[in-house]
């Protein structure tokens, strides 16, 4: 399963990605809205974990 993690706090995003990686999920990270929008336009994901308070 390919997951996009959209989170502006890098430490939290890294922790989530590390945990999911141990569970054999393929994770990509986006730290800004623009980065997430670009990745969503290019790649396909099975799931998006979105920070609702993203600036």
Task: Please name every model-derived segment.
Residues 1-55:
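N-terminal/domain-start alpha-helical segments
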């Amino acid at each position: 399963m390919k997951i996009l993690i959209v989170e502006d706090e890098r430490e939290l995003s890294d922790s989530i990605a590390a945990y999911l990686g141990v569970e054999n999920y393929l994770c990509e990270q986006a730290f800004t809205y623009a980065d997430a929008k670009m990745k969503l336009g290019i790649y396909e994901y099975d799931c998006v974990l979105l920070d609702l308070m993203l600036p």
